[in-house]
A protein has these predicted regions:
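Positively charged
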Residues: 69-86, 147-154
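A cross-kingdom feature marking solvent-exposed beta-strand/loop segments within repeated
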Residues: 10-26, 90-104
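Terminal, non-catalytic domain-edge segments
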Residues: 36, 40-65, 92-98, 102, ...
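Solenoidal tandem-repeat scaffolds enriched in leucines and small polar residues
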Residues: 3, 18-21, 25-37, 43-47
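Short sequence/structural elements of tandem HEAT/ARM alpha-solenoid repeats
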Residues: 3, 61, 83-87, 130-133
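Short capping loops/turns at secondary-structure boundaries
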Residues: 16, 20-31, 52, 56-59, ...
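Single conserved hydrophobic/aromatic residue that forms the stacking wall/gate
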Residues: 1-9
Length: 232
């Protein structure tokens, strides 16, 4: 709680005074996980029944600041709110770069848990409702249909995969989408955008999560959330 900044953010590591460690970090659900912990503390869920009220109050305040940060960092493209980058600049709140292959983008992976967290809020404000609605719309329009992973052994005897056509497979979402035109892209350690996963090297292709189906969770929970909150 002491480390949470005035701008209501949490960075990835502390103390790390420079580099991407200072960014607002949604990557690997870092901020969402911390917020869920804070909520368990102020709600005095097991094993936190012993926590004094003074600390619970601070945890609640920190959680609320986290929600404020999420609302402020939702990326707006061409006047329309979308989702989030895996990390945002701690000063400007703009999408930011982390490791060489983690470029400023819209995240089809980290954004899912952010939306699910927002949908868990009781009595959501209109601002929260709008944020959720816009993010879910992005998930609906950004799904990738008609492909699946096919694993194989390459010429060097290593396990690898490629994306192949599939007519009846569930939709996927890319890890990263361009900020210019919402196009899925991939990067190697040289930081160059590629638009076909076969164009990056074996090490990064297999050592990082480039596709996921977590958007299905968002869409399912969204329908439940609408009914619970009587949203048309």
């Amino acid at each position: 709680i002491r480390r949470q900044r005035q701008m209501c953010i949490r960075d990835r590591f502390w103390p790390r005074p420079k580099g991407y460690y200072t960014h607002i970090t949604y990557n690997d659900n870092a901020m969402v996980n911390v917020m869920e912990l804070l909520r368990e503390v102020y709600e005095k869920k097991a094993p936190y029944e012993y926590v004094p009220d003074s600390i619970c109050n601070r945890a609640r305040t920190a959680f609320n600041k986290g929600v404020e940060c999420i609302l402020k960092t939702q990326v707006v493209l061409n006047g329309k709110p979308t989702v989030w980058c895996a990390q945002h600049d701690e000063h400007t709140l703009a999408p930011a770069k982390a490791r060489a292959y983690e470029l400023p983008s819209l995240s089809g992976q980290e954004s899912d848990e952010i939306v699910i967290l927002l949908m868990s809020l009781p009595n959501p404000s209109q601002e929260v409702i709008n944020c959720i609605e816009n993010a879910v719309e992005w998930f609906k329009t950004s799904k990738i249909e008609g492909i699946k992973k096919e694993f194989f052994t390459n010429d060097e005897g290593k396990k690898d995969y490629r994306m192949v056509p599939c007519t009846d497979c569930p939709p996927l979402w890319a890890r990263f989408y361009t900020l210019e035109d919402n196009r899925p892209f991939f990067s190697d350690r040289d930081g160059v955008k590629k638009f076909d996963i076969s164009e990056i090297g074996h090490e990064r292709r297999n050592g990082y999560s480039w596709y996921n189906s977590d958007g299905l969770k968002v869409l399912k929970k969204y329908e439940q959330w609408k009914k619970k909150n009587k949203i048309q």
